[in-house]
C-alpha cells in the first residue's frame, strides 16, 4: 500500500504499540529471538490483534535496507498518523511550546529534532510540506520512538500557519545569528513557537518576516554553527528553564 511505511528497532516499535497501535499493519520478528524486549512486543501485539510474522535475518535486513533493526520491524499505515494543529492547541493544559522546522531536509536531522522535542515536552513539530524531510524509517530510528509520540504536522502554507498561531497568542521566535537579543539575555514568552531554519540557508525570507522575535544563540568557540537539533535543544531547554523560574515565583 502507498500509505505504508516501515519502522524498525525496539524504541520505534514499542512507542507505536503504546501510542497508536491501530496504525500498525503487521510486525516482523527475527526467528529465534526470545529476550524480554521481544516477549513484551509479542504480548502487546497479541493484545492488539496485530499480525506477527517470523523471518530470518536476511529478510529483515532486506526490509530495513541494511539499517540496524534489532530483530523487529513493523509496517504502519501512515494515513492513521494525521493530527490537526487546532486539536493540539485546544487540548493543552499548559502554554503551548512548538517547534517549527523551516526546510529541514535531512531525515537524520528531523529524527534528532523529534527526539529533542519529545525530551523538552514540545506539543507539536510543524514543517512545510515542500522542501522538508518526510517521516520515514530513518527518521523513526533516529528519533528513538519520538516520531511516534510527538505530533509532526506538515502544512501547505507555513506563512499562513504562523499567522494562525499568532491568533492563538503564540509568539513566533526565530533563531538567527544576527538576532537582536541573545538567548541568555531575553525574557521569553510563555506561549512560544521556535523556528529553526534550513541547515545551510537558515529561515526563508517570508518566514523571517513573520517572526515576533529574532534570537541568537551565543557561541563561545571557533565554530560558527551547530547541528539544528542541538540548537533546538538549547532554545527549548532555556524556554523550559524560564518557565520553571516563573512558576517558582508565583
UniProtKB/Swiss-Prot annotation:
S-adenosyl-L-methionine binds at residues 197, 217, 226. The keyword Iron does not apply. It is found in: Cytoplasm. CDD domains: SpoU-like_RlmB (cd18103). It catalyses: guanosine(2251) in 23S rRNA + S-adenosyl-L-methionine = 2'-O-methylguanosine(2251) in 23S rRNA + S-adenosyl-L-homocysteine + H(+). GO terms for cellular component: cytosol. It holds the Pfam family SpoU_sub_bind. It comes from the Bacteria. Keywords: Cytoplasm, Methyltransferase, rRNA processing, S-adenosyl-L-methionine, Transferase. PANTHER family: 23S RRNA (GUANOSINE-2'-O-)-METHYLTRANSFERASE RLMB. Specifically methylates the ribose of guanosine 2251 in 23S rRNA. HAMAP family: 23SrRNA_methyltr_B (MF_01887). This is 23S rRNA (guanosine-2'-O-)-methyltransferase RlmB. The gene is rlmB.
Amino acid at each position: 500500500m502507498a500509505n505504508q511505511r516501515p519502522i524498525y528497532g525496539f524504541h520505534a516499535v514499542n512507542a507505536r504499540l503504546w501510542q497508536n497501535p491501530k496504525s500498525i499493519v503487521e510486525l516482523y520478528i527475527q526467528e529465534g529471538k526470545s529476550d524480554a524486549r521481544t516477549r513484551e512486543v509479542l504480548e502487546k501485539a497479541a493484545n492488539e490483534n496485530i499480525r506477527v510474522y517470523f523471518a530470518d535475518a536476511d529478510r529483515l535486513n532486506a526490509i530495513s535496507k541494511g539499517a540496524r533493526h534489532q530483530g523487529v520491524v513493523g509496517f504502519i499505515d501512515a494515513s492513521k498518523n494525521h493530527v490537526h494543529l487546532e486539536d493540539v492547541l485546544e487540548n493543552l493544559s499548559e502554554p503551548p511550546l512548538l517547534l517549527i522546522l523551516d526546510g529541514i531536509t535531512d531525515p537524520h536531522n528531523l529524527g534528532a529534532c523529534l527526539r529533542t522535542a519529545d525530551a523538552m515536552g514540545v506539543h507539536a513539530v510543524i514543517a512545510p510540506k515542500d522542501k522538508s524531510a518526510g517521516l520515514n524509517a530513518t527518521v523513526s530510528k533516529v528519533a528513538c520512538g519520538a516520531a511516534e509520540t510527538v505530533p509532526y504536522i506538515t502544512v501547505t502554507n507555513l506563512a499562513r500557519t504562523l499567522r494562525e498561531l499568532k491568533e492563538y497568542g503564540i509568539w513566533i521566535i526565530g533563531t538567527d545569528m544576527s538576532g537582536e537579543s541573545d538567548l541568555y539575555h531575553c525574557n521569553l514568552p510563555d506561549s512560544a513557537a521556535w523556528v529553526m531554519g534550513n541547515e545551510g540557508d537558515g529561515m526563508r525570507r517570508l518566514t523571517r518576516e513573520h517572526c515576533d522575535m529574532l534570537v541568537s544563540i551565543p557561541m563561545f568557540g571557533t565554530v560558527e554553527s551547530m547541528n539544528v537539533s542541538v540548537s533546538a535543544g538549547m532554545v527549548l531547554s532555556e524556554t523550559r528553564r524560564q518557565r520553571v523560574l516563573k512558576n517558582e515565583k508565583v
